[in-house]
A protein has these predicted regions:
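Short intrinsically disordered, low-complexity coil segments enriched in acidic
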Residues: 1-7, 116, 155
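N-terminal targeting sequences that direct proteins away from the cytosol to non-cytosolic compartments
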Residues: 2-107, 186-190, 196-235
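Conserved polar/disulfide-associated segments of primarily extracytoplasmic proteins
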Residues: 38-50, 82-204, 235
Length: 235
């Protein structure tokens, strides 16, 4: 029996064991990182906890909004209001006047014909209805697509406000009324990119990118990256 030979054998086994454990640990870490990167996030529901907090970058899917959809977020976004079947929205974390809104409202506000806006059913021609609003100075519409569904896009300046606001502190120009009784609209002086997708699983989806005229060209590409990543049907 040669002790040195036995020692080399034992050391060799020990080193192989350490190497296997190290590789296993590294492999496990990689899997964990991949799993974290591929995790599908949801828009947080708790407004008090998540108001103004950054949303993690990565893939997302809606829980409530109809039609269901998935999308990707980079860093720099925070949640807007509570996700509902007929609206969800995002806000630029560095500027609370920069928004992306996805809407499928069953009611709209008609600003024409009286001092006070009236609640009405959504129009069949959403593009025509928006462009006919006396407080929106709109550009010519262009064809576009979102999630492989055809739509129309056009830009607008908010040139005025309704004579009688819905409430003190409410938006200057209310457009949509939602299932929770709240309204969404735009403010006088803003620049808006409207995108209307007419038939997403039988639903009309109106997307609007909202910002100041000065910040529009800078914010629009960031908003478009979210919109361009949309896939209808969720995840």
């Amino acid at each position: 029996m040669h002790r040195p030979a036995l020692m080399r054998s034992a050391l060799g086994v020990a080193m192989m064991t350490i190497l296997v454990l190290t590789l296993t640990a590294c492999g496990g870490g990689g899997s964990a990182r991949e799993e974290k990167a591929n995790k599908v996030h949801r828009i947080p529901e708790d407004a008090q906890t998540y108001e103004g907090e950054p949303l993690p970058a990565g893939p997302y899917a809606t829980d409530e909004f109809t039609p269901a959809m998935s999308f990707d977020l980079a860093k720099g976004w925070t949640r807007g209001g509570t996700e509902l079947p007929d609206i969800w929205d995002l806000r630029d974390i560095e500027n609370d006047a920069f928004w992306v809104v996805f809407s499928n409202a069953d009611e709209v506000y008609d600003p024409k014909g009286s001092k006070r806006v009236k609640i009405a059913s959504p129009p069949e021609d959403m593009v025509g209805w928006l462009r006919s609003n006396p407080h929106l100075k709109t550009e010519e519409p262009e064809p576009t697509s979102v999630g492989d569904e055809k739509g129309v896009r056009f830009d607008a300046l908010v040139s005025g406000a309704v004579e009688t606001p819905l409430c003190p502190g409410c938006v200057d120009l209310p457009l949509f009324r939602y299932s929770d009784g709240e309204s969404a609209g735009v403010e006088k002086g803003e620049k808006i990119r409207f995108i209307v997708v007419n038939d997403v699983k039988g639903e009309t989806v109106t997307i609007f990118v909202e910002s100041s005229p000065q910040g529009f060209e800078e914010f629009l590409p960031k908003a478009e990256r979210v919109i361009d990543s949309v896939k209808w049907g969720g995840s």
